[in-house]
């Protein structure tokens, strides 16, 4: 099972991407539940394709890209290194984002968080319902493919909502530490919800793993 509490740039990226200087291949993480465990909110077909095909493709392409990057480093080929950056960002981001996403979900999820996380949500958004509305709106409003996020601003000590296009990783592009991510690529919902993204957003709140989100939040406060 994936680590459930990841905080800080080096701690966030190192376990997932590794260090290019000491190359180690990435692997597809196991899900902490069965493909059908999130039904009826997210069906088994979506989960199987999403995990075993889409996430697996990001992992495989990341490994290939890192091998090419290592070769470019060894040759001192700066042009090739620069040319590989988009693929590193896209596939590395896809691996990071999905590795968080799977642990953010649970068949025993839904409801509201408790304790310090709930108090922080009320402090920063007014109420839990207002927070849900804002994150839902940010996620629905993503043009094309991307992610809606609840992140932690370490400098300010506050929670923030953000949206990232494509597979841009939250921390690597905004500096916010990811706590909860909602995948709004069509492959995450189209087979069940067709083009009605708001229905998918309404359903996913029933399987949010608030224990995992809370663990991430508490780790980032240390």
Curated annotation (Swiss-Prot):
Modified residues (3'-nitrotyrosine): 58
UniProt GO molecular function: DNA binding; enzyme binding; identical protein binding; manganese ion binding; oxygen binding; superoxide dismutase activity
Modification type N6-acetyllysine: residues: 68, 75, 114, 122, 130, 202
Function noted in UniProt: Destroys superoxide anion radicals which are normally produced within the cells and which are toxic to biological systems.
Cofactor note: Binds 1 Mn(2+) ion per subunit.
EC code(s) of this entry: 1.15.1.1
Gene transcribed to yield this protein: SOD2
Catalytic activity, as annotated: 2 superoxide + 2 H(+) = H2O2 + O2
Origin superkingdom: Eukaryota
Protein name: Superoxide dismutase [Mn], mitochondrial
Protein's GO biological process: acetylcholine-mediated vasodilation involved in regulation of systemic arterial blood pressure; cellular response to ethanol; cellular response to oxidative stress; detection of oxygen; erythrophore differentiation; glutathione metabolic process; heart development; hemopoiesis
Keyword terms, alphabetized: Acetylation, Manganese, Metal-binding, Mitochondrion, Nitration, Oxidoreductase, Transit peptide, Ubl conjugation
Family: Belongs to the iron/manganese superoxide dismutase family.
